Design a protein with these regions (language model features):
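Mid-domain alpha/beta scaffold segments of enzyme catalytic cores
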Residues: 44-45, 49-51, 62-348
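Intrinsic-disorder-associated, low-complexity terminal segments enriched in Asp/Asn/His/Tyr and depleted
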Residues: 18, 25, 38-41, 50-52, ...
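Arg/Gly-rich low-complexity intrinsically disordered repeat tracts
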Residues: 27, 34-36, 41, 45, ...
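Low-complexity, glycine/proline/serine-enriched flexible coil segments
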Residues: 6-7
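Alpha-helix boundary/capping motif
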Residues: 10-11, 19-20
């Protein structure tokens, strides 16, 4: 059976690069060539320098003149229960004027709307995360159809396909920790459960796409180990929907595929990780008119704050890092990506 761990934990383990699996800076640099070490260190140092300028200390009362939008956060997760208002205040002080909080199931989506009603800077996206698809009730679409009518619901999702936690993957991981059998061993029964899980995710994803096309809202997509199937479904709906693949974790070729279909890519703090070479190449090359930035808070804290909880106030760090990669000023990059987010989510 699929894991019964909380949906928010499943989401954290399946968004982009698992934080647990990110190698240490020193280890990877020791294995890199001198040229690679020099280039990587230079980029990260520049990003940190810009981040320090872009992110004023909490004691500073004035906020930045630039405006940024955190296009993907999970403010309803337990990590923010105790200090959400402080989190929002810090975000404002760093120039993050708006935050899109993303539902991962019906309960989470309802809570996202409650936050959007309570706080003017918060907007909601409602949907069923792929890792929740087989656990959500079968008639979830009828409630989603009602939730999307709320004036502060600006998108549908997170939805998509995630093959990183299929039963066979979990079984292989368990076997690899024992002395019995090979890590890729799995049974026919497991294959059947894989197919059932993939079918549930695909059906839910297509229902979200159809709903987005019907109501005219953008769609927020989570993708993990499922590019071919994700692109195939997107191609079917691309003339009718506008999508963003959030927490982008692939290279420039995949980014260009999305842009060619008329969609967007959103980068989280994983672009700053030492082993995210392909992601950085995508961030450098993709059209500036198709980029957005996010935190995916509370996960994927950008360098140099890796040991801290991620929160919307850290968006300037990711924005500054990508701006440095592209040879842009932070102000210019913020202006362009904010404009993209406003257009995508229908914000004024």
């Amino acid at each position: 059976m699929l894991s019964k761990e909380p949906a928010e934990k499943m989401c954290s383990r399946s968004t982009g690069l698992d934080q647990e699996k990110v190698f240490s800076h020193k280890k990877l640099l020791s294995e890199a060539s001198n040229e690679e070490r020099s280039t990587t260190n230079s980029t990260i140092k520049k990003g940190i320098w810009y981040w320090n300028r872009a992110s004023p200390p909490e004691t500073r009362n004035s906020k930045l003149t630039m405006m940024l939008i955190d296009t993907h956060a999970h403010l309803d997760f337990p990590e923010f229960t105790e200090d959400l208002e402080d989190v929002l205040l810090r975000a404002k002080r760093t120039g993050v004027e708006r935050i899109i909080t993303i539902g991962i199931n019906l309960k989470s989506s309802r809570k996202a709307i409650q936050f959007a009603e309570r706080y003017p800077e918060i907007y909601a996206s409602v949907g069923i995360h792929p890792n929740s698809a087989s656990q959500e009730r079968e008639d979830f679409l009828s409630e989603l159809e009602e939730l999307v009518k709320h004036p502060k619901v600006v998108a549908i999702g997170g939805t998509g396909l995630d093959y990183s936690r299929l039963p066979s993957k979990q079984e292989s991981a368990e076997i690899s920790q024992t002395t019995f059998g090979a890590a890729d061993f799995h049974t026919i029964e497991t294959e059947i459960r894989d197919e059932a899980e993939m079918a549930a995710q695909s059906a839910a994803f297509e229902q979200h796409l159809e709903l987005a096309a019907t109501v005219g809202k953008s769609i927020v997509i989570h993708q993990r180990d499922s590019w071919e199937d994700t692109i195939e479904l997107l191609q079917k709906y691309s003339p009718r929907v506008r999508a963003v693949v959030h927490g982008f974790d692939a290279g420039p070729e995949r980014a260009q595929e999305l842009v060619d279909l008329g969609h967007f890519v959103s980068f989280s703090g994983n672009v700053t990780f030492i082993n995210a070479t392909e992601v950085r190449e995508a961030a450098k090359s993709v059209s500036i008119d198709r980029i957005m930035v996010e935190t995916d808070a509370p996960y994927f804290t950008p360098v140099p704050n890796r040991k801290k909880r991620c929160e919307p106030a850290l968006v300037p760090g990711t924005a500054a890092f990508i701006a440095t990669l592209r040879g842009m000023s932070l102000a210019a990059f913020a202006e362009r990506t904010t404009r993209n987010a406003q257009r995508f989510f229908g914000l004024s």
